[in-house]
From Swiss-Prot:
The chain crosses the membrane at residues 526-546. GO terms for molecular function: ATP binding; cytokine binding; growth factor binding; metal ion binding; transmembrane receptor protein tyrosine kinase activity. Gene3D superfamilies: Immunoglobulins, Phosphorylase Kinase, domain 1, Transferase(Phosphotransferase) domain 1. The gene is KIT. Keywords: ATP-binding, Cell membrane, Disulfide bond, Glycoprotein, Immunoglobulin domain, Kinase, Magnesium, Membrane, Metal-binding, Nucleotide-binding, Phosphoprotein, Proto-oncogene, Receptor, Repeat, Signal, Transferase, Transmembrane, Transmembrane helix, Tyrosine-protein kinase, Ubl conjugation. The record marks 569, 938 as: Interaction with SH2B2/APS. ATP binds at residues 597-604, 624, 672-678, 798. Residues 569-571 are annotated as: Important for interaction with phosphotyrosine-binding proteins. GO terms for cellular component: plasma membrane; receptor complex. This is Mast/stem cell growth factor receptor Kit. Belongs to the protein kinase superfamily. Tyr protein kinase family. CSF-1/PDGF receptor subfamily. It catalyses: L-tyrosyl-[protein] + ATP = O-phospho-L-tyrosyl-[protein] + ADP + H(+).
């Protein structure tokens, strides 16, 4: 073998010398005479085994170089001979010899390697609606069934087609968007054995089929000189290849600066924010700014208008005639619209330049953020004749002030002031009214109540009642009694456009003199009938009022205790609690969605709040509001709920207040949104998937440690007053089923700008550890309420909400619960009460205390461990029920309750309120039942919350709440956080 190889080497050297001699002796070849180089061995393909030698010879008078190419990688040599002593699989590829004329010849070499059938080039990208090459060329062309296979035995999409080439790889035809993240292998059969390449994950770049979507934060801006102009353009497209810019129309010069920020949202959505700012705007910066974006499909643009003024302004537009006439007892609204920039700071109505009135509403003309036009309405109700005059609206901002005046004239029916004086033979009638009344005289013989024969007056005088031009006008009319020759009655009638009135004077002749017989104001049968009708109407209204008061009335459930006198609790009137206007939130930044709950007078609506946390962030919230059918009582009750929530402050296990809208429209109370609804229905949904055993997962502790470490900076630096519970991503791979359930919950507390690929809490099973966690969290929340001297009075599973991470939050649906149609609320007196959840002292003596809340908590535990069953099953609330409660009847242990938890229930149901545990003691008892990891989790989450928990106040130690003769009057308004 060695001798044969030596012979070949000798022949090769001899041939090489010959070529050199030939090349040196022959004249140069012209380009037109060039021919293709020749390669030895003269084959298109060469197959060698791994470890063998590759020896290739290129013969050409004008030889330049060898080029080796595989998987897009090139290497070159300038020798005529290419020698690879020990071939490897990576030497598989195309070898090309190129001469000076650019002509070339190629040979493809396969280096057969049993251990490496495929050469791989990663990653794999493809453009939608184009072909893409899976680079997995073979090292052995003699294999069979060279194709693509899905990972883990999964089938490829039915519409996926491909073409295989052993030298290049496999080309996928017409890539579709649905192929994105498709996992596949190159496969082939080698000597009867199926071989797979490393896995490829296809990443599809979307085809551009539409122009970019462009929007701006605001479509118009109004600024004063020196203020900052900042507008953000949002461009949405399928890829980052989109171009964008800001352009000021009709101008090439601008002091504006731009800043770009971009990110991918999902697989086929790319977003870019292009922010344009002018740090100090000037009048000549006014104009139209266009955000322009284009891609290969086309272009799109959107504009925003900037108007810069040298100083602020106020322009007032009365929406009615400024001279107003209104009848006595009627209502009128004085309406003005005004434009103001900056925003108005002061608004006021002045009556007769002396006194102010607050019966007005002021609100933006439009919900648009760019709105500078406002509406102000002064409501004048049941105006009296003395309330006519000038009403002036004043408005001001930091730069200017302006005003407009309305002249209000009250039309009044004439009033007869004097009619029964007979002086020096003259009879005088004096009447006052507006407009000026007209007085007519009538005479009839005898004593009559109404006369019809007209008599002309002797003298008529008109004068104003006061200096003010808005008062009544007084008219004097005089008649000579010599006109009358017989006994009779003289009637004075005064009338104007509003109405009329009359009076009569009866006289008789005695000798030659006339003397007054009787003077009276007309008292007609019509007036008598009116009085009777009015009396009947009053009786009817009184009956309706009585019936209304007998109906169950709504009242705020949560009560804040001020002090205790023996058995009597003195509550703070919630209407007297302060309301801090820092909670105000612009109602035009709320976008309402579906209704979450509704009662007779109120409802809770899902909404999106823009700018509640950050100026450019959206957050899902719950908004409590009144229905149009609500009365004054319900309006006051909703405001009381708002004040109680703002007084309590924030805690992880109550539904926290986020904001409110109390100005310029109906009251709106904005609270945290709990996506999984109330705990009662959650438990009932989970009955079929409940896992009875209690599982300890020590890996969970490490999982939460990692979670909390990742959030440490955000916990310490956060300025929010609540937790933003949006879904996130868990970075720990669970190893067991319980781990999987726990990690999904944890993921909901991690804040990232990516879409989480985790299971939702609502899809996970329920186990005993969850029930213990719920009972523990509710006890913590109730301990917090107790520390704030707040009594809940309606603690039940239906009033516990559930959010991400299976965090429970205590709430009071209040106006938004339809208690009229809820069988849990029973009519007792003039109220509907949750009797089955109430302590005996509350049922029979109407006493609500911290201890009665503990009783209700025991009923809640029974609901919890029965997975949402109704308490006292099969027992209607009737006299028998009340008798059994008095005699000490208590429910048996629910099906899934551990013995220790049933012991807690029984202590909560002690007949003596003073022997019931406090919520602080209940928390300590349950801590012994829950797993160490769950306790550690809750503690860390509570510490991570912006509102950390301090030790709860133990009310049984601080005060003797119920039935103690030793308890004296003690103030409870001490501010302690839990």
């Amino acid at each position: 073998m060695r001798g044969a190889r030596g012979a070949w080497d000798f022949l090769f050297v001899l041939l090489l010398l010959l070529l050199v001699q030939t090349g040196s002796s022959q004249p140069s070849v012209s380009p037109g005479e060039l021919s293709l180089p020749s390669i030895h061995p003269a084959k298109s393909e060469l197959i060698v085994s791994v470890g063998d030698e590759i020896r290739l010879l290129c013969t050409d008078p004008g030889f330049v170089k060898w080029t080796f190419e595989i998987l897009g990688q090139l290497s070159e040599k300038t020798n005529p001979e290419w020698i690879t002593e020990k071939a490897e699989a990576t030497n598989t590829g195309n070898y090309t010899c190129t001469n000076k004329g650019g002509l070339s010849s190629s040979i493809y070499v396969f280096v057969r390697d049993p251990e490496k059938l495929f050469l791989i080039d990663l990653p794999l990208y493809g453009k939608e609606e184009n072909d893409t090459l899976v680079r997995c060329p073979l090292t052995d062309p003699e294999v069979t069934n060279y194709s693509l296979t899905g990972c883990e035995g999964k089938p490829l999409p039915k519409d996926l087609t491909f073409v295989a080439d052993p030298k290049a790889g496999i080309t996928i035809r017409n890539v579709k968007r649905e192929y994105h993240r498709l996992c596949l292998h190159c496969s082939a059969n080698q000597k009867g054995k199926s071989m797979l390449s490393k896995k490829f994950t296809l990443k599809v770049r979307a085809a551009i089929k539409a122009v970019p979507v462009v929007s701006v934060s605001k479509t118009s801006y109004l600024l004063r000189e020196g203020e900052e102009f900042a507008v953000t353009c949002l461009i949405k497209d399928v890829s980052s290849s989109v171009d964008s810019m800001w352009i000021k129309e009709n101008s090439q010069q601008s002091k504006a600066q731009t800043k770009k920020n971009s990110w991918h949202q999902g697989d086929f959505s790319y977003l870019r924010q292009e922010r344009l700012t002018i740090s100090s705007a000037r009048v000549n910066d006014s104009g139209v700014f266009m955000c322009y974006a284009n891609n290969t499909f086309g272009s799109a643009n959107v504009t925003t208008t900037l108007e810069v003024v040298d100083k602020g302004f106020i322009n007032i537009f009365p929406m009615m005639n400024t001279t107003v006439f209104v009848n006595d007892g009627e209502n009128v609204d004085l309406v003005v619209e005004y434009e103001a920039y900056p925003k108005p700071e002061h608004r006021q109505w002045i009556y007769m330049n002396r006194t102010s009135t607050d019966k007005w509403d002021d609100y933006p003309k439009s919900e648009n953020e760019s709105n500078i036009r406002y509406v102000n309405e002064l409501h004048l109700t049941r105006l009296k004749g003395t309330e006519g005059g000038t009403y002036t609206f004043h408005v001001s901002n930091s730069d200017v002030n302006s005003s407009v005046t309305f002249n209000v004239n009250v039309n009044t029916k004439p009033e007869i002031l004097t009619h029964d004086r007979l002086v020096n033979g003259m009879l005088q009638c004096v009447a006052a009214g507006f407009p000026e009344p007209t007085i007519d005289w009538y005479f009839c013989p005898g004593t009559e109540q109404r006369c019809s024969v007209p008599v002309g007056p002797v003298d008529v005088q008109i004068q104003n009642s006061s200096v003010s031009p808005f008062g009544k006008l007084v008219v004097y009319s005089t008649i000579d009694d010599s006109t009358f020759k017989h006994n009779g009655t003289v009637e004075c009638r005064a009338y104007n456009d509003v109405g009329k009135s009359s009076a009569s004077f009866n006289f008789a002749f005695k000798g030659n003199n006339k003397e007054q017989i009787h003077a009276h104001t007309l008292f007609t049968p019509l007036l008598i009938g009116f009085v009777i009708a009015a009396g009947l109407m009053c009786i009817f209204v009184m009956i309706l009022t009585y019936k209304y008061l007998q109906k169950p009335m709504y009242e705020v459930q949560w009560k804040v205790v001020e002090e205790i006198n023996g058995n009597n609790y003195v509550y703070i009137d919630p209407t007297q609690l302060p309301y801090d206007h820092k909670w105000e939130f612009p109602r035009n930044r709320l976008s309402f969605g579906k209704t979450l709950g509704a009662g007779a007078f109120g409802k809770v609506v899902e909404a999106t709040a823009y700018g509640l946390i950050k100026s450019d962030a959206a957050m899902t919230v719950a908004v409590k509001m009144l229905k149009p059918s609500a009365h004054l009582t319900e309006r006051e009750a909703l405001m009381s709920e708002l004040k109680v929530l703002s007084y309590l402050g924030n805690h992880m296990n109550i539904v926290n207040l986020l904001g409110a809208c109390t100005i310029g429209g109906p009251t709106l109370v904005i609270t945290e949104y709990c996506c999984y609804g109330d705990l009662l229905n959650f438990l009932r949904r989970k009955r079929d998937s409940f896992i009875c055993s209690k599982q300890e997962d020590h890996a969970e502790v490490a999982l939460y440690k990692n979670l909390l470490h990742s959030k440490e900076s955000s916990c310490n630096d956060s300025t929010n007053e609540y937790m933003d519970m949006k879904p996130g991503v868990s970075y720990v791979v669970p190893t067991k089923a319980a781990d999987k359930r726990r990690s999904a919950r944890i993921g909901s507390y991690i804040e990232r700008d990516v879409t989480p690929a985790i299971m939702e809490d609502d899809e996970l099973a329920l186990d005993l550890e969850d029930l213990l966690s719920f009972s523990y969290q509710v006890a913590k929340g109730m301990a917090f309420l107790a520390s704030k001297n707040c009594i809940h009075r309606d603690l039940a599973a239906r009033n516990i909400l559930l959010t991400h991470g299976r965090i429970t939050k205590i709430c009071d649906f209040g106006l938004a619960r339809d208690i009229k149609n809820d069988s849990n609320y029973v009519v007792k007196g003039n109220a509907r009460l949750p009797v089955k959840w109430m302590a005996p002292e509350s049922i029979f003596n109407c006493v609500y205390t911290f201890e009665s809340d503990v009783w209700s908590y025991g009923i809640f535990l029974w609901e919890l461990f029965s997975l949402g069953s109704s308490p006292y099953p099969g027992m209607p609330v009737d006299s028998k029920f009340y008798k059994m409660i008095k005699e000490g009847f208590r429910m048996l242990s629910p099906e899934h309750a551990p013995a220790e938890m049933y012991d807690i229930m029984k202590t909560c149901w002690d007949a003596d309120p003073l022997k019931r545990p406090t919520f602080k003691q209940i928390v300590q008892l349950i801590e012994k039942q829950i797993s160490e990891s769950t306790n550690h989790i809750y503690s860390n989450l509570a510490n991570c919350s912006p509102h950390r928990e301090n030790p709860a106040v133990d009310h049984s130690v601080r005060i003797n709440s119920v039935g103690s003769s030793a308890s004296s009057t003690q103030p409870l308004l001490v501010h302690e956080d839990v």
